Amino acid sequence: FFHQWYPYIDVSAGGSVRGTIAAVDMVLPLIDEDTVVIPGHGSTVSDRAGLTAYRDMLQAVTDRIQVLIDEGRTLDEVQAARPTTEWDPVWGQNFMTPEHFVRLVYGDLTGEL
């Protein structure tokens, strides 16, 4: 869990964005509003709302990129569509830039990594 950072997902080692979403979906029912969530990366602790925001961002970006892939868009065209724009001011300010994250998700979804 990367608190307010776009995550690095090691697709080459079997990771996937959909697998990351599924993992968060398994955890969310196990915690409540009083649970302190310790992220693996990020400068502060989080909570259920923070983990939910992470999951929702991952799902929305994945859905947006999948639509563009289904339309036959290339990576350059997907990058130009800026599918992460609304999250970039918070999530895109660390080592995983919006461009790198879009490339990672696109590559994961198309198998072109």
Predicted regions and their residues:
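Glycine-rich, flexible loop/turn motifs
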Residues: 2-7, 47, 83, 87
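Alpha-helix capping and helix-loop boundary segments enriched in small/acidic/polar residues
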Residues: 11, 52-53, 93
